[in-house]
Amino acid sequence: MGIEEKAGNLGIVTTTLETVVNWGRTNAMWPLLFGLACCAIEMMGAQASNYDLSRFGMELNRASPRQADLMIVAGRVSRKMAPVVRRLYDQMPEPKWVIAMGDCAACGGIFNNYAIVQGVDEVVPVDVYVAGCPPRPEALIDGIMMLHQKVMREKLSGKKEAPIRIDQPLVQVK
């Protein structure tokens, strides 16, 4: 049952410009991977064939922030690294999104000292938080799917919603 059957024999499909633009944004996100600790290993696992992030249009990992629209910060951010993270975020073109992957990126993790930023949201605005130490690839995929839902609700005016926190992965592993 395709879309042409739902629309009838008119040959016309109606939608809004926001829906088409947001659909395109969700299906062509190019991530800038910022792996700083053990969460980066799980992020690489999510790119493997077992999980296949290319089905979300994310097969192109960008090395340049000027070509990326999604920053995935995975791991702890030190005070010395914070200006670098901010500079890379500022170089990304609009619209841009950030996923904080892991407890260290979300809240500093177990490193409650002067050298570690207590959450990357002190440096850049975060759209989705993925909890875990380290979070499994399924949790990252859940976070990406939540970000897709958030992007589909965005208006062309550019106003963003509040961040989404994923406390536990939606996919349970037995």
Swiss-Prot record:
It catalyses: a quinone + NADH + 5 H(+)(in) = a quinol + NAD(+) + 4 H(+)(out). GO terms for cellular component: plasma membrane; respiratory chain complex I. It is an enzyme of class 7 (translocase). The keyword Iron-sulfur applies. One of its GO terms (biological process) is aerobic respiration. It is found in: Cell membrane. Its cofactor is [4Fe-4S] cluster. One of its GO terms (molecular function) is 4 iron, 4 sulfur cluster binding. Disulfide bonds: none annotated. Binds 1 [4Fe-4S] cluster. Its EC number is 7.1.1.-. [4Fe-4S] cluster binds at residues 38-39, 104, 133. It is a peripheral membrane protein. The keyword Iron-sulfur applies. It comes from the Bacteria. InterPro entries: NADH_UbQ_OxRdtase-like_20kDa (IPR006137), NADH_UQ_OxRdtase_20Kd_su (IPR006138). Its main location: membrane. Keywords: 4Fe-4S, Cell membrane, Iron, Iron-sulfur, Membrane, Metal-binding, NAD, Quinone, Translocase, Transport, Ubiquinone. NDH-1 shuttles electrons from NADH, via FMN and iron-sulfur (Fe-S) centers, to quinones in the respiratory chain. The immediate electron acceptor for the enzyme in this species is believed to be ubiquinone. Couples the redox reaction to proton translocation (for every two electrons transferred, four hydrogen ions are translocated across the cytoplasmic membrane), and thus conserves the redox energy in a proton gradient. Belongs to the complex I 20 kDa subunit family. HAMAP family: NDH1_NuoB. NDH-1 is composed of 14 different subunits. Subunits NuoB, C, D, E, F, and G constitute the peripheral sector of the complex. This is NADH-quinone oxidoreductase subunit B 1. It comes from Chloroflexus aggregans (strain MD-66 / DSM 9485). The lineage of its organism: Bacteria, Bacillati, Chloroflexota, Chloroflexia, Chloroflexales.
